[in-house]
A protein has these predicted regions:
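Phosphate- and other anionic-substrate recognition elements at nucleic-acid/protein interfaces
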Residues: 1-138
Length: 138
């Protein structure tokens, strides 16, 4: 991980994103905010944060890969993390959007997260078709 980049941890949900901004040289995020999960709001955030180097990080989930694709179209580095491989400290059971976003930023900076390959739209469509067929047959 590039220690000179700002890491932006994101907890992505259908309606909004909680964003934790961890600049270089800081141990904790300096800002945590919630934005709408809409194209214009994401573009505004990305434009604001890409004045320097930034990497956007979020866990794969039911919202898919659209946020990663949009950030990529804007010229940003965006990585999707495997949630099953995210380290969890014993006793750390309280889950909030803010804590999840902060944790992603810190763990990515520390090099403790596993990045996944984002499927193409065609691969994703084929996967959806296979799953729908399996559901219909079952």
């Amino acid at each position: 991980m590039d220690q000179h980049s700002t890491v932006v941890g994101m907890d992505v949900h259908k309606r909004n994103l909680t964003v934790a901004i961890l600049p270089p040289g800081k141990a904790r995020p300096i800002e945590v905010l919630t934005i709408e999960n809409r194209g214009k709001a994401i573009a505004r955030m990305a434009t604001r944060l890409t004045t320097g180097r930034a990497v956007f990080v979020y866990e794969a989930g039911p919202c898919g890969y659209e946020v990663q694709r949009q950030l990529h179209r804007l010229g940003c580095r965006a990585v999707v993390i495997a949630p099953a491989l995210t380290p969890i400290r014993p006793g750390d059971r309280v889950k909030t959007n803010r804590r999840d976003a902060e944790k992603l930023a810190r763990l990515y900076r520390a090099g403790e997260l596993t990045e996944i390959r984002v499927p193409t739209r065609e691969e994703e469509a084929a996967r959806d078709l296979v799953r729908a067929r399996e559901d219909a047959v079952a």
